[in-house]
Amino acid sequence: MSFLNLNELPFVGMSYQFHGEKQGAPFSAYFVNAKPGRGPPLHTHPYVEVEFTLEGTATVTVGDDTREVNAGSIVVIPANTPHRFVNSGAGVLRQIDIHASPKFVQTNL
């Protein structure tokens, strides 16, 4: 069992990173705080990812589909599917990205 504070997690780029393998959990999570115009490059993971948008607006591409999402949106991304998001709003984008793996694996395209 672990009790953690978000500020105890590593902050890399634009996200606090929860690595499940370090906590005995079967998943990993990113707590995203992206400034306008920010987002990762097009990439894939060998597992499902679920993005929960908490605040802000993003343009999300999953495969050939591009949509605008905002607070309350949930995006389910199949394994090995190219995807990315960019903060397309004027304020901060906050989202929680759940990775169905205790170890984070990403291939940038």
What label would you give each PLM region?
Residues T107-L109:
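Short, charged, solvent-exposed linker or helix-capping segments at domain edges/interfaces
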Residues L6-L42, I98:
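A short glycine-rich, His/Asp/Glu-containing loop-to-beta-strand
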